[in-house]
């Protein structure tokens, strides 16, 4: 499928929001991803937008620091945007989508730009009228890299069933975020996770440790945890 690039905007020094418009109706579930075809290969990116807004696909591309790969991606997409060139994307992929038939409380844990996945899950849950508790934990290097922090604060204020806990490794604003590792904060705040549906997105190591800790130490069953990274662990 071909998409036009409608907008590219910086969210931090190294993270960008890319808005794509498919040239035909595009169906996906909250929590799925697409592969974007580039001159040097195809790369996966989680869809940050909600399926109810299927006219556009929002991607978050980048990281807490500069990297050669992300620089190449953004250079190519920016050039395509400037020239009006279309980009080719795959159909929606991944099996860690939101299980909207469940009434269990949700625990959403994101690391870095894993928030793109988490944001789609969260927004779709609310759009469907979920009223069970939803806990959102987001870990990043510092406050700058909590790049949709204000939006999440507003969502939590507007929805009584949503709790948002930001966590930064470097503490510059202790009044706004906990300091430490996001998984350690989850472990500190919950003694039992046996009744939760748990959605994870972030570095592979984070997801692997989360599975081990939540299952071995907090009573979660493997089938309660959802992450596309599990296919590679």
Swiss-Prot record:
<keyword id="KW-0274">FAD</keyword>
<dbReference type="InterPro" id="IPR050415">
    <property type="entry name" value="MRET"/>
</dbReference>
<dbReference type="InterPro" id="IPR039261">
    <property type="entry name" value="FNR_nucleotide-bd"/>
</dbReference>
<dbReference type="Pfam" id="PF00175">
    <property type="entry name" value="NAD_binding_1"/>
</dbReference>
<dbReference type="InterPro" id="IPR017927">
    <property type="entry name" value="FAD-bd_FR_type"/>
</dbReference>
<protein>
    <recommendedName>
        <fullName>Probable flavin reductase</fullName>
        <ecNumber>1.-.-.-</ecNumber>
    </recommendedName>
</protein>
<dbReference type="InterPro" id="IPR017938">
    <property type="entry name" value="Riboflavin_synthase-like_b-brl"/>
</dbReference>
<dbReference type="InterPro" id="IPR001433">
    <property type="entry name" value="OxRdtase_FAD/NAD-bd"/>
</dbReference>
<keyword id="KW-0455">Luminescence</keyword>
<feature type="domain" description="FAD-binding FR-type">
    <location>
        <begin position="1"/>
        <end position="133"/>
    </location>
</feature>
<feature type="binding site">
    <location>
        <begin position="111"/>
        <end position="115"/>
    </location>
    <ligand>
        <name>pyridine</name>
    </ligand>
</feature>
<keyword id="KW-0285">Flavoprotein</keyword>
<comment type="function">
    <text>Probable flavin reductase in the luminescent systems of different marine bacteria.</text>
</comment>
<dbReference type="GO" id="GO:0016491">
    <property type="term" value="F:oxidoreductase activity"/>
</dbReference>
<comment type="similarity">
    <text>Belongs to the Fre/LuxG FAD/NAD(P) flavoprotein oxidoreductase family.</text>
</comment>
<dbReference type="GO" id="GO:0008218">
    <property type="term" value="P:bioluminescence"/>
</dbReference>
<keyword id="KW-0560">Oxidoreductase</keyword>
